[in-house]
């Protein structure tokens, strides 16, 4: 086991097994999503029709936060053999909590983090281990806005990744819209290209009309993925896929 993997595992354990007497849980949110698109990019410069079933869980604590999701995709027609499973687990340790000193506050920077991420499965059957610093921002108008800067121990040559995650709610009378998503950008190395993935969702809060905001959403997801999986255009075209989605929180 590499030093990076040991560091990541230690961070996960430190966050997940904080003694109950010294830990406070702020929230836990789970959701199930269904997405459908005819435009997902596949190997061989072809497009595929897929339905994705996604389970997500996010938690917030005084010591930091966790995020976990797993995707199960179902191909259709000629793409029925493209089914696979992909997931990520991302713990974040608050450096304010870890050091006992308030490193952020009411200004632009909310906190600094030690962040990790484990990626598994998917079309290339990855096992990637990621660790690095992060910043949680007090971005005006946003529910959350975070940046992460990872060193990536991957099955190809190790590289670096910058991740931006955001969530913003917009209200127009009784209509509530949620705009959230992420951006991943990773560096190029000898055996793979730099890749850029922009993946926002725009969702209508259906539950808000019945007095239950934040429960049931319907909308679209857009995936723009240049050099998908670090592959160049000779192998796979840039992905530009719009998906219909429904999402239920519980």
Residue ranges, per PLM feature:
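Short glycine/proline- and aromatic-enriched beta-strand/turn motifs that initiate or cap beta-hairpins
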Residues: 23-73
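Outer-membrane beta-barrel "beta-signal"
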Residues: 238-250
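Membrane-embedded beta-strands of outer-membrane beta-barrel proteins
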Residues: 55, 89-91, 131-133, 164-166, ...
